[in-house]
Amino acid sequence: MERSPYSNTLLFNRNTKLSLSIGLLLLFPALVQGADSLYDQQILQARQGQYAPFLSYLQQYQLRHALTPSQVADWLQVALWAGQDDEVVKVWRRYQVYMPLPARGTAAAAQALRNQKQWQASLTLWQQALSQAPDSDDYRIGYIKTLADARKDGEALSEARRLVAEQASVAHLQTLSYVYLRLGKSWDQLLVDTQILDREPQNKAALASLMATLTRNRIDSPALGLANSVELTPAEKRNLQLNAAAELVRLADTPSREENARYALARTALAQYDAMIAAWHPDPQAAPDIIRARIDRLGALYANADYAQVIREYQNLIAQQQTVPDWAIGWVISSYIALKQIEPALTLIHQHPSWLTSQQNEEHELFYALLDTGQYPAAQQYVARFTRNAPYIRRLYGSPTPQPNDDWLTAQSLNVHYLAATNALPQAEARMQRLAATAPGNQGLQIDYAALLQDRGLPRAAESQLKAAESLEPASLQLERQQAWVALDLQEWRQMDLLTDDVVARSPRDLNTQRLARAREVHHLSDLRLSVGKGLHSDNPVSGTHDLSFETAIYSPPLADSWRLFGGHRFAEGNFEEGKGSRRQLFAGVEWRPRDYWGELELSSVNFHGENKPGVRLSAAHDVSDRWQLGGELERISQQTPLRALRNGVSANRGEGWLRWYQNERREYRVSVAASRFTDRNRRQEYTLSGKERLWQTPWLTLDLQPGLSASANSRTDTAYYSPARDLAATAALAVDHTLYQRYDTVWSQQLLAGGGSYWQKNHAAGAITVLGYGQRLRWNNVVDTGVMLNWDKRPYDGKRENNLAITLDANIRF
């Protein structure tokens, strides 16, 4: 039987020493008079822990003399004290045939058989001992403990409780504690051990038992607090210190705690580990404990969000040929994922597949990392595997009523996120709306539904959804984060700052919080906008040949939340039959961006036809709702004035009004009406209808139909620039957007445009329009968005089809 310094497994052995000594004194009066006989001297030595002299003496003595039952009982008890269980059983079997032995001898044999795990034989002897001495507490206790060892749980617990009910002494409570230990009821055992210590605060055995029970229940700091009251080996003391530090790591890694409290616990644990490792380093016996401390320390580093240090320490352990167990590898995997190093994380997951189903993967960070890196098949397999193991209901042992399965709800949520990330937003919204409607008290689902509405370009609907969810838990971090994202889309700058400040103060190291803080940081950066167009081959009368145009504009960081200053330069030139035409424009202005509104006022100096003229532009837009937006623009010396007109000294003032209807990311239309007044007294009206219809999508590709209808009328046709009396164009194009590479905030994609239509001009026959285009685009780190596009089109001008091949470059850089 296992002997533990924390378990009272051999209570009979120790408690019966005193009773044996008293019995021996009564049996041998000479001992009382001075203990002058050799036998009596050996008995006294055995009482003091020197068992060998007595056992050796008795071995020789029994060869020359017949032993009395009392002497055999002495032999059995001293051999039991010496831990010679085989000898006890052997002597018992030899002498119990010839003589009736005293109860104490029978009990010694019963204990030896118990130590040998011969439970049934031991129980039989305990019953025999109790029949000889029915009032013996020691024998009754030994019998109950053996019942517990034999896994006769019901009988052992019943007898132990009866014993305590008769008298709640320390010995009886210790017996009940032992039964609870064998039954695995560690919390019940903790209660009993606490009661024992309340009765005898200085009881060393009770202190040791309580310390062991606290350790089994992972209440390690109080267990360490008892260490100075109990005699422990250095290894046992180190184990308690490690357990106490590990308790801090577990507490720090609990998501339900406030972030500041978690980081404080993590820093405390790190300080303890550093102190322990430094103190134990000179001791070679402590080498295994140092390795354990270093492995446990990975959890403290992870809880402290020191992900890079987690990886460095893990690599050091591997370099030293140390094995990191499965229960610790999750910290390393999560650290790799947090640092956006998914490849080594996947390698470790392949080596430790049990991590996928462990509690360390409750946040499903691997799934979101797969989505962020465009590994959609792997993400789909992740969802499918999780869903297979998450039925709608689960049955709990002992309960006749099926219970809802939280894992099923998590699986549905993961599936919605997968659909949203793979461009299947209608299906994602339908599922999330159903989940949110059937669980109105689940704030997480309401927030996820709002996020999905925002992804579909409906921030006001998302705001309303979040407002309803606010009543459930107003101070929720997840809620405030999503409200900040929506406020950013709605241009609620002050609200966004307040929410972000609060979220950052409460969870500064949370990755989702850092992402939000990064978005706000980008919002407060300056903005450089650049666009360049170059005609490679063109013979049309609008742009001329070898045309070149570019525009640069720099916007300041936000001022007083809604204002930005801007300034820049525009240039355009082209070759025409009558010579080269050019336009240069320096401009500066102010932008206004409160909620639901946008406006720009621009003042400029325009150089064309050898002279400078002042220009003014006023642009405005109003978001009536998520669906409707209207706007307009007034401009003196309009940018839409044909370059050829400027070449010939003709400029135009222009006014435009437009209305946009937006259903979601799959459908939108825009209609505009514009009127231009040229200085040569020409009056132009323009009407445009354009739209987008999503036809097809995959995780990496979208296919859109872009219909267009435009018409114009000019009051004069005898102009130096292209000015048809009436014209009408109807086109339809297919636009493909294909993601070539995606890794977190870096996305590289290619675009393909192919379309055609018909063009009608008054006094000329209708002609075909053909449009082709190919381009690529790169978005990097939320601060660079740039693309290049090669376009070719062929359409009629005054009845003659002309070609135009051009390349355009645009960039938006935040700095």
Residue ranges and their predicted role:
Residues 1-7, 51, 513:
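Disordered, low-complexity tails and leader-like regions
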Residues 79, 113-116:
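Extracellular cysteine-rich, disulfide-bonded domains and loops characteristic of secreted proteins
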Residues 2-33:
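Gram-negative bacterial Sec-dependent N-terminal signal peptides
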Residues 58, 68-70, 74-77, 85, ...:
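Gram-negative and organellar
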Residues 31-75, 81, 90, 104:
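N-terminal leader/linker segments that initiate helical-solenoid repeat arrays
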Residues 4, 9-11, 36, 70, ...:
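Short linear motifs centered on Gly/Pro in flexible linkers and helix caps
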